[in-house]
Amino acid sequence: MKEVIFAENAPKPIGPYSQAIKAGNFLFIAGQIPIDPKTGEIVKGDIKAQTRQVLENIKAILEAAGYSLTDVVKVTVYLKDMNDFAKMNEVYAEYFGESKPARAAVEVSRLPKDVLIEIEAIAYKE
């Protein structure tokens, strides 16, 4: 059985997709970009500011589904510029301290709304 998850405290999807889908014990979170859910605007600033907003959006979706950051098992990070990798990691480590999920980081030529970062995640909970 699958369930569509919608978090009020996360940005509304900007296309024909769901914020997240719960399938069994898994939660599949769609790629999140640094949109402030209160204003609907892209967070201006450097990679650190954008990474923080993306992770706050993911956290809000997790919580709406009854999950937490410690339940995240896999993350894919899409970066506009791999030179931002170290700075992104500084913020990322604040969110995933001891509970580090498996992860891939990929440089891409362009992201929606010309943001610097997009992150998607998969969580699992017994």
From Swiss-Prot:
UniProt xrefs under InterPro entries: RidA, RidA_CS, RutC-like_sf, YjgF/YER057c/UK114
EC annotation from Swiss-Prot or TrEMBL: 3.5.99.10
A GO CC annotation given for this chain: cytosol
Job description of the protein: Accelerates the release of ammonia from reactive enamine/imine intermediates of the PLP-dependent threonine dehydratase (IlvA) in the low water environment of the cell. It catalyzes the deamination of enamine/imine intermediates to yield 2-ketobutyrate and ammonia. It is required for the detoxification of reactive intermediates of IlvA due to their highly nucleophilic abilities. Involved in the isoleucine biosynthesis.
Assembly with partners or alone: Homotrimer.
EC category name: hydrolase
Biological process according to GO: isoleucine biosynthetic process; response to toxic substance
Organism in which the protein naturally occurs: Pyrococcus furiosus (strain ATCC 43587 / DSM 3638 / JCM 8422 / Vc1)
Name by which UniProt lists this protein: 2-iminobutanoate/2-iminopropanoate deaminase
Biochemical pathway: Amino-acid biosynthesis; L-isoleucine biosynthesis; 2-oxobutanoate from L-threonine
Domain of life: Archaea
Key word Hydrolase present: yes
Gene3D superfamilies: RutC-like
